[in-house]
Design a protein with these regions (language model features):
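Long, charge-dense, solvent-exposed interaction surfaces that engage phosphate-rich ligands
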Residues: 253-255
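ASCE P-loop NTPase motor core, strongest for the SF2 helicase catalytic module
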Residues: 3-248, 257-516
Length: 516
């Protein structure tokens, strides 16, 4: 794979990028009235990079239309090639245009296809799906076709690309675009290796969180975009990661931002969507008592003793993680981990009361939890109060998922209960104006993406986000730890997350400060 070279063309490109807003690239007529001004800037930015066969990270906030900006880029490219051919002016080369490849999570493959059909129906799109034999036939047929007849855009998932990687090697694409690029944050995974093996003239990565926890994640994405630009990982770690993370070196941070800045475009909703109504976040506390408090105290003490005994640095990590999960479940509702528990859950009662008041006032509510079993308990309690709800978890069939999403926009059901992992991406639920996070999740980016199911283009009402916290527990201290960990990601590029596996023993102990 060709490594990035800092040459004269690179200097010209940087100068062009500094004046990207003044560079004139015609927006495809089919999208001229659809693209917002900031999306046109994103389109121009990508075209400027592509002109020099370079890549970048489109890191806009969730809901700002990263997909649409890419559709504009690809539509412009293939329309211009078609027009050049019709005019008999193909430049110095006679080759037909190469197809482009989009790689995304499996849950978004059909969404990409639908977006092309909606916004740029003239682009020929091939969705890779089916059995191994069917996929092989799809790709072989594509290769047999002339570029003027075959698909211009091929869309596949990370998992299928890994399985079919041999079919892609030996051919070159015009663009390779990876969606939800945080999937390749670990450079050692087969998924990361597979996308980096593809030959393409220009590459782009779409993600709202290019840095979730470690700077190595940013390095891995740049290793996909322009191998060698941030050097080898060993050199990057010595020059930037260690000085910034361990020593808070401002010079290293400034140097890294200066290097990556031209290749990362990040816009926030509050900056570009002036018409988007406000968003307010509130923390709602509950206080455990009785048996719930006793169970939490005993479990927290047991875990503190294990940590003090060095369990986190030995072979006991899995047991520590298991006990942490149990503590979180006790905060949600002790019945999640104690079958014979018949007492109250302070947070559940607070939650039901909040939903009852909101639904009575005519609001529609999204509620997210990591635990599907907790969502089922909430649904049962709501039924006791005469409140109906939809429930979406990982096991929900795709057809039922689509039906519920469509129904929620128009039916009288006021509550949509969604597991965090099942509903974090690919849903548009702007009918809701209240979002409840029942339990704090280590991954703040996932929580924010969940909130953006409601707070996005199309939302006409102010949105209120409630985070439910059990006071004087691990949940309360987790919020403090998240803020500290997020600071690094915010300094470099974006928002971030806390990964339990990355915490030191001292940081784990801090989760229990001022708690039993």
């Amino acid at each position: 794979m060709k490594l990035f070279q800092r040459d004269e063309a690179y200097g010209m490109m940087v100068r062009d990028l500094k004046t990207a807003q003044s560079v004139s690239y015609a927006v495809p007529a089919v999208l001229e009235k659809t693209l917002r001004e900031y999306q046109k800037i994103g389109y121009t930015w990508m075209r400027t990079l592509a002109r020099y066969h370079l890549g970048g990270i489109l890191a806009d906030d969730m809901g700002l239309g990263k997909t649409l900006q890419v559709i504009a880029l690809l539509t412009a490219f293939y329309q211009e090639k078609t027009e050049q051919k019709a005019a008999g002016n193909e430049g110095s080369g006679s080759e037909l245009p190469l197809p482009s490849l989009i790689v995304c999570p499996a849950s978004l493959v059909y969404n990409w296809g639908q977006e092309f059909a909606r916004f740029s129906p003239g682009i020929r799109v091939l969705l890779i799906a089916g059995t191994a034999k069917e996929r092989q036939e799809q790709l072989e047929e594509q290769m047999r076709m002339e570029a003027s007849e075959g698909a211009q855009v091929i869309i596949t998932s990370y998992d299928l690309l890994k399985r079919d990687r041999a079919a892609y090697l030996g051919r070159t694409f015009e663009y390779e675009i990876i969606d939800e690029a945080q999937v390749i944050k670990n450079a050692k995974t087969q998924g990361a290796k597979a996308v980096k093996e593809i030959s393409a003239n220009a590459r782009f990565a779409l993600t709202g969180t290019p840095v979730e926890n470690r700077l190595s994640e940013l390095w891995s994405i740049f290793d996909f975009l322009m191998p060698g630009f941030l050097y080898s990982y060993r050199k990057f770690r010595e020059r930037y990661e260690l000085p910034i993370v361990k020593n808070q070196d401002p010079e290293a941070l400034t140097a890294l931002r200066r290097m990556t800045g031209p290749f990362v475009l990040r816009r926030l909703k509050k900056d570009v969507l002036r018409e988007l109504p406000g968003k307010e976040e509130r923390i709602v506390y509950s206080a455990a008592s009785g048996r719930q408090q006793k169970l939490y105290t005993a479990s927290a003490l047991k875990l503190k003793e294990a940590l003090a005994g060095g369990a986190w640095s030995g072979n006991g990590k899995l047991e520590v993680l298991s006990q942490l999960m149990r503590l979180r479940q006790i905060c949600c509702d002790p019945a999640l981990c104690f079958e014979d528990y018949a007492g109250e859950s302070a947070k559940l009662e607070t939650c039901v009361s909040l939903i009852a008041s909101a639904s009575a006032a005519g609001h529609k509510i999204l509620l997210f939890s990591q635990f599907a079993s907790m969502l089922e308990r909430i649904q049962e309690r709501l039924l006791q109060e005469g409140i109906s709800s939809h429930l979406l978890v990982g096991a929900t069939p795709k057809e039922e998922r689509s039906r519920m999403v469509q129904a929620f926009a128009s039916d009288e059901v006021p509550v949509f209960l969604i597991s965090l992992k099942a509903g974090g991406t690919g849903l548009n639920l702007t009918a809701a104006d209240i979002v409840i996070h029942y339990d704090p999740w280590w991954n703040v980016a996932a929580q924010n993406q969940a909130t953006d199911r409601a707070y996005r283009i199309g939302q006409e009402k102010p949105v209120t986000v409630y985070k439910l916290i059990l006071k004087d527990t691990i949940e309360e201290n987790l919020l403090k730890l998240q803020n500290a960990k997020l600071a690094l990601a915010a300094q470099v590029v974006s928002e971030g997350m806390v990964s339990l596996g990355d915490l030191s023993q001292n940081e784990l102990m801090e989760l229990f400060e001022q708690n039993p």
